[in-house]
Structure formats: structure tokens, C-alpha cells
Curated annotation (Swiss-Prot):
UniProt keyword list: ATP-binding, GTP-binding, Nucleotide-binding
InterPro entries (UniProt xref): P-loop_NTPase, RapZ-like, RapZ-like_N, RapZ_C
Its job: Displays ATPase and GTPase activities.
Disulfide bonds: none
Gene3D superfamilies: P-loop containing nucleotide triphosphate hydrolases
Record protein name field: Nucleotide-binding protein Tmel_1373
GO molecular function, one term: GTP binding
Binding site for ATP: G10, L11, S12, G13, A14, G15, K16, S17
Pfam families, sorted: PapZ_C (PF22740), RapZ-like_N (PF03668)
List of residues binding GTP: D58, S59, R60, S61
Length: 278
């Protein structure tokens, strides 16, 4: 009897093959590159004797409209979680250069950059159907495994809230549902004695606690997150990802992320990540 069905989808080069191997290590029966038109026929047969199944569905699988239709059918019939793997363009380009593989949409008259852009446009509908988006740009295989384990175990546990601090100067994360920009508060980087510290340190916390508007904005973030969690749970979703951004990802964003972690940690499973803390 099928209890766990995972659909891995996303951009070419974003790590679906690596993720599929990790799911296989976790006990999933894995199928890659299955034509989308036969999935509806095969699933009822497979689901009789398999508890955990992972499918890769991507641009090789068939027409985008057919893929959307199949995913919608699976969501109506099975306990499916759709995981969309994403990555920044420059990362995808480097990965294709490193592996020397061709992008599935690459043609003689098309550059790799244009092929990636075309695939992004094609996958907008699938991205909207996805339950979880994972940005693999900065993840090694071990970190990707940790993300997958957290995502899949959250199905059996209470709601999962992921809080990510980051610096805008290093790029906007692709796998968050909300982004709160805290750059309008004074930057501790320019305060004597605080430059080398982070938002985890007492001195930085005291500085920001005493900054006008910080507490009020923190309360506003909590109200938005509370509202989103309630609506996500009503729709059967199990994870909300919140990004907190400042300039360098060292002080203000870390402080706000730490405060949110303390506030929510007792009521739901909270994962705290500081992407750019050195």
C-alpha cells in the first residue's frame, strides 16, 4: 500500500539525480525518466506492493500540459509531495560545464543561457503546483540530504517552519515563500565594536533591541507568519519557508531570524538557517 509518494521535479542541472539517489538510500523505490502518459496506468499497479515511491518528472517526461495534468491527478488520488529543485542560472551553467552534459532543451541555434530561460518559463505551472521548493545553488549532497530528510519527516510530524537569514549582496534565495527586508534598520556593521560580531551576539542584540521600530516590525512579521501558517495548514501544506534579508546577512537578518526561532520553536518544528554568516 502506497504511503509516501514523492515527485521530484525542477530545472535540469538542479540536482534531481542526486536527490533521487538520496531518496533511494532512504528506502524509496525510485523511477527516473518515466513517460508522463503512462504514469496514471502504472501507479495503481505499483502502489499495491510499494510503500514509498519517488518519481522524477521533468522536461524529458513529456508535454508540460500533460505533466501538469498528471500531477493534479496524483494529488487527488495519492498522498503525494511535489518537490521542485531550483538553482541560480550561473550555478546551472557551471554544473553543465563541469559534467559536460547537454541541456535537454539545448539546440544548435540556442545558447545554454536561453535553454535554461526557456525551461524556467515552461516550468512556471509546475512550480505553482509544487509543495516545496529547494534552492540547491549552495547545497552539497550532504546538505541536500538533510533538507530532504527534514521535508519528508515533516509529513509525519507537526507543521514545519523554516527560517532563513541571508544577505541581499549574495543573492536572493529561490526557495522561500516570504521575504522580509530589514535593511531599513541601522546596520551594526558600522557601529564601533560590532562589525566583527553577528546577530547571535549579545552586543548586537542589545543594539537592535534598543533601535526604534524593531520590536514593532518583529511583531508585524509574526502576524504575517501566523496568518500564513494557518492558511497553509488549511490547504494541507506542511512547510512554510521565511527569508529574512539584510545587506550582508551577518547582523540584522540573523537577529530577526533568531527572534522568530525562539518565538515559534515550541509550537511547531522550526529549522533555522543562517546562509551567509561567516
Amino acid at each position: 500500500m502506497l504511503k509516501n509518494l514523492v515527485v521530484l521535479t525542477g530545472l535540469s542541472g538542479a540536482g534531481k539525480s542526486t536527490a533521487l539517489g538520496l531518496l533511494e538510500d532512504m528506502g524509496f523505490y525510485c523511477i527516473d525518466n518515466l513517460p508522463v502518459k503512462i504514469i496514471d496506468q502504472i501507479l495503481p499497479i505499483i502502489s499495491i506492493n510499494i510503500e514509498s515511491l519517488a518519481l522524477v518528472i521533468d522536461s524529458r517526461s513529456g508535454d508540460i500540459d500533460d505533466i501538469v495534468s498528471v500531477i493534479e491527478n496524483m494529488k487527488a488520488k495519492y498522498p503525494v509531495k511535489v518537490i521542485f529543485l531550483n538553482a541560480k542560472d550561473e550555478v546551472l551553467i557551471n554544473r553543465f560545464a563541469h559534467t559536460r552534459r547537454n541541456h535537454p532543451l539545448l539546440k544548435e541555434e540556442t545558447s545554454l543561457e536561453k535553454a535554461i530561460l526557456e525551461e524556467r518559463k515552461l516550468f512556471i505551472k509546475i512550480l505553482e503546483l509544487s509543495d516545496i521548493v529547494v534552492d540547491t545553488s549552495n547545497l552539497n549532497p550532504h546538505q541536500l540530504r538533510e533538507r530532504l530528510v527534514g521535508i519528508l519527516t515533516s509529513v509525519k510530524k507537526k507543521f514545519r517552519l523554516r527560517i532563513l537569514s541571508f544577505g541581499f549582496k549574495y543573492g536572493v534565495p529561490l526557495d522561500v515563500d516570504f521575504i522580509f527586508d530589514v535593511r531599513f534598520f541601522p546596520n551594526p556593521f558600522y557601529v564601533v565594536g560590532l562589525r566583527q560580531k553577528s546577530g547571535k551576539d549579545k552586543e548586537v542584540k542589545n543594539f537592535l533591541y534598543n533601535t526604534q521600530g524593531v520590536k514593532e516590525f518583529l511583531d508585524l512579521i509574526k502576524k504575517v507568519v501566523d496568518f500564513a501558517i494557518q492558511r497553509y495548514e488549511n490547504e494541507g501544506r506542511t512547510e512554510l519557508s521565511v527569508g529574512i534579508g539584510c545587506t550582508g546577512g551577518q547582523h540584522r537578518s540573523v537577529f530577526f531570524a533568531e527572534e522568530l526561532f525562539k518565538f515559534y520553536n515550541e509550537n511547531c518544528k522550526v529549522i533555522l538557517e543562517h546562509r551567509d554568516v561567516k
